[in-house]
């Protein structure tokens, strides 16, 4: 028992995904760890050492005040040019450029960039969905300024409130270069490894693995996104239980392929 919270030892041989239902609409400045704990307690969810919380990027960004009113944006010459080429709002393009270090590809309706943390994605992850609009505002939502840092702060705050080490993954839906559709992807990680090096381990026939690295944070982020959904599901936080990996914490930045080994840029 830690500060009134129940602590159990995980003994599972299966992985469970438990949505934390009832998370309210998040506003700038909200205490997100506190909201998560109160909502989980209301649902009588007991925390277990080793639990992992997958949190949708959108509520992180809202709590951090990453909302921008497009009506206040003045597009640059470059944004006007790219806006014409892609047929995108040049004000949105201006924000995309501000959030990026490099334009990777563009064509009509598509603008793929590399953001300041090395993630390659469309529109720098800037989104309009599930944002309340009115005649005076034209809101868009940016990604957290530093998703790994956001995850670390939430991880630390959850520990201070519960006395339990909870892994934290911030996930977002990102498209893939070689396949159709978006996939839940880890953009911020704390308290667990984002990637596990399996090289040197033996396969079923005793052969050593030579190149295998498992992007476990992406796998967990994708699994949670099945419950979180993309529309009006209103389930932005999912608890993953039973995944036990006793290895050092590695942030989501560990998933970014170094430039010298990237064959496609």
Give the ranges of each region predicted by the language model.
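N-terminal and secondary-structure boundary signal
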Residues: 2-265
């Amino acid at each position: 028992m830690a500060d009134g919270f129940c602590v159990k030892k995980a003994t599972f041989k299966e992985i469970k995904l438990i949505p934390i239902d009832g998370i309210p609409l998040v506003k700038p400045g909200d205490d997100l760890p506190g909201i998560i704990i109160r909502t989980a307690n209301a649902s009588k969810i007991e925390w277990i050492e080793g639990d992992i919380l997958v949190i949708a990027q959108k509520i992180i960004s809202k709590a951090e005040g990453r909302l921008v009113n497009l009506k206040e944006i003045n597009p640059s010459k470059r944004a006007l040019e790219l806006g014409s080429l892609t047929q995108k709002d040049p004000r949105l393009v201006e924000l995309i450029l501000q959030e990026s270090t490099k334009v990777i590809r563009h064509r009509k309706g598509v603008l793929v960039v590399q953001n300041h943390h090395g993630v390659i994605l469309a529109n720098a992850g800037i989104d309009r969905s599930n944002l309340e609009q009115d005649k005076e505002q034209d809101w868009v939502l940016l990604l957290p300024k530093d998703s790994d840092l956001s995850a670390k702060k939430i991880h630390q705050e959850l520990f201070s409130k519960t006395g339990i080490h909870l892994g934290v993954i911030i996930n977002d839906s990102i498209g893939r270069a070689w396949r159709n559709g978006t996939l839940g992807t880890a953009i911020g990680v704390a308290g667990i490894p984002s990637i596990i090096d399996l090289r040197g381990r033996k396969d079923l026939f005793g052969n050593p693995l030579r190149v295998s690295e498992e992007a476990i944070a992406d796998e967990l982020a994708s699994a949670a996104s099945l419950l979180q959904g993309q529309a009006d599901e209103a389930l932005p936080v999912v608890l993953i239980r039973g995944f036990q990996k006793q290895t050092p914490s590695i942030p989501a930045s560990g998933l970014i392929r170094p430039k010298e080994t990237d064959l496609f840029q």
